[in-house]
Amino acid sequence: MRQSIRYTLLFFALIKLQINYAQTGKLALNFGNNGVIITDLQQSTDYASAITMDKSGNVLVAGTTEKGYDTGKQVFVAQYNNRGQLQTNFGNNGKILIPVAHQIRITKIMMQYDGKILIGGTANEKDKTAEFFILRLLADGTPDKTFGINGLAKSKFAVAYAATKSNYILNDFDLDFYNNIIAVGANNSSMLDQTAIIKFTPSGIIDENFLFEGMYVGSFPITNSNNKNVINNSCTATKVVALSNGTYLVGGTQYMSNANSAFENFTVQ
């Protein structure tokens, strides 16, 4: 077993102990193997990068697995019960592997109100532009075929903003009251990075009634802390929250070329 899976899943175990035993800082010995879980997915290099918990107390861990660059990566999701055991009624004995693209980075996993599972990240084929993606699974780990194409929804920034020739990196997403998905990140260009925002409907279709045909790439008209107009600014959205009034709160970092302090935080609604 490779060390990467040991380190990533050990971190998962430490999060578990902090939830249950924050007051003592001791391992929960009744969880996994004396408080630690080690899972080898397919004798491969595995990277756990997102974690959440469902309403029954089951823990879901998401990330990527690969046997080598030529074969590419796959999304994995593993589900554990509150004792740290793989849930055999989820996926294939507690684990699922799903091919999405050659290169994948998982950013977040979260639960829908109805028990469905959302996984978001960035994906691209070899020598192709990276795009946002959202994968939706049913509660048993099966891809939800009513969402996107066979459970997978992707952004189309490279088509709508072809002139930028950038990769689009997802940093966060959230779910609103109507199960719409709002996702934010940045285009990683050779020039100034810009905020990227997209909205998907509950069926995984880009909501063309939102902003500019469902998407936005650009820098917000932000003033710096001295209330001076920013001439050239680089904005990267790192967090989004869907508010109860139907609006979205987006936060991130901006770089300002004509400011005394180059880096500042921004929040827009």
Q: Which functions belong to the PLM regions below?
A:
Residues Y21-Q269:
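A sequence-level/structural motif corresponding to short, flexible coil/turn segments enriched
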Residues M1-T24:
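Bacterial Sec-dependent N-terminal signal peptides
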